[in-house]
């Protein structure tokens, strides 16, 4: 969500699509403006034909950021992501928003990221510092590339600079630099 927030801060509109229909965590993290009688519909509802696309996109408490939650858990999320409705959703996002960010489950847990990757411009591999092994990152990269997905880059998140051998240097340098008065720079 930090990436979506940064894009929105640049006056861009962003649609975040949560495709983790097995174990989503985004619905609990964001406050969506719900207008559908209190019920939050999501991707699984749309892809299974229960609701139309206009019923699943919600504004968030972040100006310019909209969300399409995963919806309820389903036994066949990969099959749903392979439907023409998912492709139509991506096309809708491209036409109506400056950016479409698609959040997928970890590739070690499911093949969903490779399926989604075929319908988007590319993938950004996100790894957690001191959690994600280098082997898992290499396997993820290989899985995506073998599926024809273009790798756009990588993000290391959950960083604790005080635990990093370089964090002390960068933290002190930039902290001191930005902490000085303009005439001292």
Regions found by a protein language model. Name each.
Residues 1-185:
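P-loop NTP-binding module
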